[in-house]
Amino acid sequence: MFYTLPKQLEINNLTVSYPHGTVLQNIFLTIESGKLIGIIGPNGAGKSTLLKTIIEQIKPISGEIFYQGAPLKNQRARIGYVPQRAQVDWDFPINVWDVVMMARLKKIGWFSSYSKKSYECVKAALEKVDMLKYKDRNIRELSGGQQQRVFLARLLAQEADLLLLDEPFTGVDFQTQKIIFSLLKEQIASNKIVIVIHHDLGESIINFDELILLNKKIISHDLTTKILNSKKLSTLFGEHIYAN
């Protein structure tokens, strides 16, 4: 009998420093496939730095990152990333279709022509987020929620195995939040790993399978239900924070 190896992400002894000091210290994480993971922590906890280190925007001073037992740095095409909205130049002159089509470059390379499959992937991704009707519209003409849907479509069109999203729910309406969670759950049903930086400690947090509590180091990594029933959130944010 043959077995398929789990799509597992491993982070071993990761430390990241900026000129003003250490941002992440001795990070050890193991994340199994088919999980929707939420990362929460106070401002300056290193949440965005962790994702940027995974995608190699930031170089650590120590540590290694593996995916399925092999160095992740050799598997960049398998990583999909949605940055914070504040990091995107929304005045850049590009339409919705072209933003999403850019996701296919990791699959086909910079100097290849887009295939029929690429066009089908982009169309399907825009349909999933209900944005196909805006395909010719410039991204700066969209609302905040619509812009976030476009970047989610780009993530889907890439067909990556490891999906990283930095505060995708900031500034979006309730309907867009529902769409995003629904599509992310579809991805984990396909045995992918989805990691989301999340700032809302309200009811939406229960959508995550597991939570990582981060404040420069790992405070806790456990099932969401266990963390919500513990005192670890109050330890991280202060005694005034609690979850039902």
UniProtKB/Swiss-Prot annotation:
Gene3D superfamilies named in the record: P-loop containing nucleotide triphosphate hydrolases (3.40.50.300)
Subcellular location as annotated: Plastid, Cyanelle
Gene Ontology molecular function, alphabetical: ATP binding; ATP hydrolysis activity
SMART domains: AAA
InterPro entries hit by this protein: AAA+_ATPase, ABC_transporter-like_ATP-bd, ABC_transporter-like_CS, Metal_Ion_Import_ABC, P-loop_NTPase
Span of the signal peptide: none
Domain ABC transporter residues, every copy: 9-241
GO cellular component: cyanelle
UniProt entry keywords in alphabetical sequence: ATP-binding, Cyanelle, Nucleotide-binding, Plastid, Transport
CDD domains per record: ABC_Metallic_Cations
Coiled-coil annotated spans: none
PROSITE patterns listed in its UniProt record: ABC_TRANSPORTER_1 (PS00211), ABC_TRANSPORTER_2 (PS50893)
Residues binding ATP, per UniProt: G41, P42, N43, G44, A45, G46, K47, S48
Family: Belongs to the ABC transporter superfamily.
Name the UniProt record assigns to this protein: Probable ABC transporter ATP-binding protein in ycf23-apcF intergenic region
Organism this protein belongs to: Cyanophora paradoxa
Taxonomic lineage of the native organism: Eukaryota, Glaucocystophyceae, Cyanophoraceae, Cyanophora
